[in-house]
A protein has these predicted regions:
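Structural/interface elements that position substrates and couple domains in central-metabolism enzymes
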Residues: 1-444
Length: 444
């Protein structure tokens, strides 16, 4: 099948590359000339394990190509996938300007029957808005063309997106016509043949399913962080509690690790958007409000532990950070807990030395510029360079390379002996036996 994927960000690139790898012909469109020219040269603008190789392989065969011109890409397309951003508006609701702009442009240039698929995370009712936008453009042109609008949300985990797309636990397709259902069945036939479960439902149902899934994941994280806070005060080890509940098959072990809070491009904005959606129809989202509030509080936990040690005035203190990305396996800094921590440390007068194996390009763009210029915030190229003369080491992101550190290098480099573990990577007794003071989440 011939597809156009509009939006060459995280969702668009992963979806386009993987669909091309399954035998479809895909054109990825983006308004950024710099991004498209880079992709044509083989420069992938995001870090995702395996993505570079799959893009290169399919670009070489001609199955995957890139352009800034949507009208040019549309000429032979059967399916248009909208995969543009839906950032939060001031009230937390999803901003649909980019989605509807794409819909209008499709309506302006559509020449034959097609299927429009929303892969962007959008509120319930967005498909109707997309249809209205397309209809208005077709009416302005004085033409009638049959088309369908479907919802096909993605369920990709950053750092595992290729595996998630190629070996999905489910594929949700929201359709309101038999024609749309058949086209989506054809699109995903290669996946179904390999055992993927294709779930059909209405368009509005699919739109809601995406938000509900992310809200549930965020709820599990915030719930476990709340339990961790209680464990700290009662002298209980939250890791033992986690083991005790996660082995119950009704609960399972996914998204039950306490830590410094969740971030990324999905959970924070989707919880806000779902809560906003609820309020817009007169329904008070009490659980969602609590999930978001707990996460905001949890993001301050690392800084609060440092204040307990050094006091609120940290002038003359150097704090080393291991990890900046919101999770391992990605360079994504959106809503990362490290941002909250760095801003608080700088405000308290501390100097910060930070290392992350993948955020050399993304972190400097979102961290305070003035602090970088006056060297109060320094990004280093090695985890042991980060700890030089540090009064404390804070583990922010649980990259595998931090799991078994060289203790000799830590003792030699650090001025202090405090380790604050925001991801519970280490065993408290062992760290203390090695001569460090150790603080972790929900453990005494």
């Amino acid at each position: 099948m011939n597809l156009v994927v509009v939006g060459s960000g995280y969702v668009g690139l992963v979806s386009g590359a993987c669909l091309a790898d399954k035998g479809h012909r895909v054109i990825c469109v983006d308004i950024s000339e710099e991004r498209i020219e880079g992709l044509k040269r083989g420069k992938v603008p995001i870090y995702e394990p395996g993505l570079d190789a799959i893009i290169a392989r399919n670009a070489d065969t001609g199955a995957l190509s890139f352009t800034t011109s949507l009208p040019e890409a549309m000429r032979e397309a059967d399916i248009f996938c909208i995969a543009v951003g839906t950032p939060p508006d001031e009230d937390g609701s999803a901003d649909l300007r980019h989605v509807l702009a794409v819909a209008r442009e499709i309506g302006q240039h559509m020449e034959r029957p097609a299927l429009i698929i929303n892969k962007s995370t959008v509120p319930v009712g967005t498909a109707e808005k997309v249809r209205a936008a397309v209809d208005a453009e077709l009416a302005a042109r004085g033409v009638q063309i049959e088309y369908d609008v479907a919802s096909n949300p993605e369920f990709l985990k950053e750092g595992m997106a290729i595996e998630d797309f190629m070996q999905p636990d489910r594929i949700i397709v929201g359709v309101d016509s038999q024609r749309a259902r058949q086209l989506l069945d054809d699109l995903y036939e290669p996946f179904v043949k390999e055992g993927a479960r294709l779930i059909h439902m209405g368009v509005r149902d699919a739109e809601m399913a995406k938000y509900a899934a992310n809200a549930m994941l965020a709820t599990r994280i915030s719930f476990m962080n709340e339990i961790a806070g209680l464990c700290e005060r009662l002298g209980v080890d939250v890791e033992h509690v986690r083991l005790g509940i996660s082995t119950d098959p009704r609960i399972g072990d996914k998204f039950l690790r306490s830590g410094a809070g969740y971030g990324g491009s999905c959970l924070p904005k989707d919880v806000q958007a779902l809560a906003s959606m609820a309020r817009s129809v007169g329904f008070e989202p009490m659980v969602l409000n609590a999930v978001e509030r707990r996460n905001q509080v949890q993001k301050q936990w690392l800084f609060e532990k440092l204040v307990e040690e050094f006091g609120p005035d940290m002038k003359g203190r150097t704090i080393a950070l291991w990890g900046l990305a919101f999770k391992p396996g990605t360079d994504d800094m959106r809503e990362a807990p490290s941002i909250t921590l760095v801003e608080s440390l700088l405000k308290a007068g501390a100097q910060v030395r930070a290392y992350d194996p993948e955020t050399k390009d993304t972190a400097p763009r979102v961290m305070p510029r003035e602090a970088q210029e006056n060297c109060d915030l320094v990004f280093v190229k090695d985890q042991y360079e980060a700890v030089q003369e540090a009064d404390a080491l804070v583990l922010v992101t649980e990259w595998p390379q931090f799991r078994s550190p060289d203790i000799r290098k830590l003792h030699k480099g650090m001025r202090g002996d405090l380790i604050v573990d925001g991801r519970n990577m280490y065993i408290p007794a062992k760290v203390r036996e090695l001569g460090f003071r150790y603080v972790s989440v929900g453990r005494s």
